Design a protein with these regions (language model features):
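Glycine-rich, charged/polar anion/phosphate-binding loops
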Residues: 45-51, 114-118, 227-228
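M16 family metallopeptidases and their MPP-like homologs
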Residues: 1-8, 58-79, 99-224, 240-248, ...
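His/Glu-rich zincin catalytic helix
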Residues: 1-107, 145-146, 247-369
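Surface-exposed polar/charged interaction patches
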Residues: 182, 237, 268-272
Length: 369
């Protein structure tokens, strides 16, 4: 009992069904099988604090979880549940964008932080809004916890800005358009995960056509006030149902946070005065002055492999190939011979970190976020 078989792929349905019945049809449940119970996770009046260390734990990090009730499985097959998922996705996406932006600041105590809202650890009967932070230095762990919770409180107290919400909706609708235009090229793993969610927790699995039409109507109609109201529900005003988990790299001579320090960091975050977030939107072109265009020196077609090779006046070689694998997708990559091997030994570390630094540095006058 309580087992399922999911088959996804280009298979002979009748033959596959017959084989499943042949292989599994004779399995019987034991006479006195143990009942399957979903153990309830109790509410807690006082915070739970867990501190641990291990030599194989490479980084020090801290996480605070605010437990709350799950969405009932019996009510998931509804438009209301899809709306709930949209509000949650919008709030978490915009909050995580703020964490990414904050981490770029020199005085930010964490190198990275994020928020999620899902199962409380592995429990099916309790969910949790979780905030995670990894400090720049182990000595800043408590400060990282404070800063990460303060950022969430900023969203709770002042909400998100219209410009943030406009960007989120534009990105979501763009993703929907792309998924819909490539609906006949979905991967088997996508279908499998939808079936698995439906079997385990009654997650709805509407068709891509239904989802597309519903979201195209829903997204423009939901005001930012609805998202902000959802955000307000995530952090409780008291200390009930709070869990703090801190994992540390075990190292000789290291000093680890105490229960009192972590609780004090959380209380500081809950009591600290916060100001509204300012979305510094830049309405200017990425390139203010267009470069002088070059010329195409030569063009050569390869009919056998279906590509065209161009030689440009700046010495670059461009290879163009048209495919119909995915609609509305253009993939571009560039490389130059030599790379870091052209630099001396003293620039080894600089060359090694170059790609990561550039990826986190934004473009032109625009920051990463």
């Amino acid at each position: 009992s309580n087992q399922g078989i999911i088959v996804i792929g280009d298979v002979d349905v009748d033959h596959t069904e017959a084989m499943i019945k042949k292989l599994f049809g004779g399995i019987k449940n034991p006479a006195n099988q143990a009942p399957v119970l979903d153990e309830p996770v109790p509410d807690t009046a006082e915070p739970i604090v867990i501190i641990d260390k291990d030599k194989e734990q490479r980084t020090n990090n801290v996480q605070v979880m605010f437990k709350h009730d799950t969405y009932p499985d019996s009510l998931k097959n509804s438009v209301e549940y899809i709306l709930y998922g949209y509000l949650k996705g919008a709030a978490l996406n915009m909050l995580n964008d703020r964490y990414t932006e904050a981490a770029q600041k020199a005085d930010c105590p964490y190198v990275g932080a994020g928020a999620s809202d899902d199962n409380y650890i592995f429990a099916k009967t309790k969910d949790a809004f979780s905030i995670f932070a990894q400090p720049k230095d182990p000595s800043q762990l408590a400060a990282s916890l404070t800063a990460a919770v303060v950022e969430a409180r900023r969203a709770v107290e002042f909400g998100f800005t219209p410009t943030e919400y406009d960007r989120y909706k534009a990105d979501l609708l763009s993703s929907l358009d792309k998924a819909y235009s490539n609906k006949d090229k979905r991967k088997n793993t996508q279908f499998f995960n939808e079936c698995l969610g439906y079997f385990l927790t009654n997650e709805p699995m509407p068709s891509i056509d239904y989802t597309y039409q519903l979201m195209k109507q829903m997204v423009p109609a939901i005001p930012i006030e609805a998202v902000n109201e959802y955000m307000k529900q995530l952090i409780p005003k008291n200390d009930s149902n709070i869990v703090i988990v801190n994992f540390n790299n075990e190292n000789e001579g290291a000093v680890y946070p105490t229960r009192q320090e972590l609780l004090a960091a959380l209380q500081t975050a809950k009591q600290q005065q916060v100001t509204a977030y300012v979305d510094n939107v830049k309405n200017e072109p990425l390139i203010t002055k267009k470069p002088t265009p070059g010329t195409i020196k030569s063009e050569k077609k390869n009919d056998k492999l279906g590509y065209t090779e161009l030689k440009l006046s700046n010495g670059a070689t461009v290879v163009l190939k048209h495919t119909d694998l995915k609609k509305d997708e253009v993939l571009l990559s560039a490389e130059g011979f030599g790379g870091s091997s052209l630099y001396g030994e003293k620039d080894y570390l600089n060359a090694k970190m170059f790609d990561e630094v550039i990826a986190n540095s934004g473009l032109g006058q625009f920051s990463l976020t």
